[in-house]
């Protein structure tokens, strides 16, 4: 239902979830909810336009990501579902500029502080070489942080204790880690 979709969108969007992941998770049942597939009426209600369809289908990467989503519906139904999911993500990002700005800050700090080691303090957090110092004195650690250029020349970051445990790192993921770690600090104080 719409309430569950909104809840799912807010939870994922806060940490940088993209439309393809959102669309896929809705089809399988986001966070234990029953599967949801958006239809034409819902897409129209969201304000999906013919231009949105043209823009979406005109970008090869969108179509590739859409085709990689496991589905049992038709291609047309999947396209409508993806257009609606993308519209929700776009609306969230437009309306939640402070959140998006924090992802962008954290994304820049992955390179400048966590990788290059330039200390930076943001409110109660200190970003430094491969770690973020929390108000409790504990640290979030990102060992062996490395960056590799993707096909568009953008640096994609990963970290881990060894080659088998490497994980992607990006601004939204850093925000998620910070929120969870600070929440743990608060709970431990209670």
Which residues does each PLM region occupy?
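Conserved catalytic core of nucleotide polymerization and phosphodiester-bond processing enzymes
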Residues: 1-190
């Amino acid at each position: 239902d719409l309430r569950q979709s909104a809840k799912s969108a807010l939870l994922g969007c806060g940490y940088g979830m993209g439309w393809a992941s959102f669309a896929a998770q809705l089809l399988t049942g986001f966070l234990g909810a029953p599967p949801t597939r958006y239809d034409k009426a819902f897409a129209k209600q969201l304000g999906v336009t013919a231009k949105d369809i043209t823009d979406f289908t005109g970008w090869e990467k969108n179509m590739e990501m859409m085709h990689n989503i496991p589905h049992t519906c038709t291609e047309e139904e999947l396209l409508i579902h993806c257009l609606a999911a993308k519209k929700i993500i776009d609306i969230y990002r437009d309306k939640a500029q402070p959140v998006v700005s924090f992802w962008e800050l954290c994304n820049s700090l992955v390179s400048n502080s966590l990788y290059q080691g330039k200390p930076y303090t943001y409110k109660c957090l200190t970003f430094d070489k491969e770690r973020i110092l929390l108000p409790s004195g504990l640290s979030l650690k990102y060992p062996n942080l490395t960056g590799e250029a993707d096909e568009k020349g953008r640096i994609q970051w990963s970290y881990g204790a060894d080659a088998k445990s490497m994980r992607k790192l990006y601004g939204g993921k850093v925000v998620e880690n910070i929120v969870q770690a600070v929440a743990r600090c608060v709970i431990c104080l209670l």
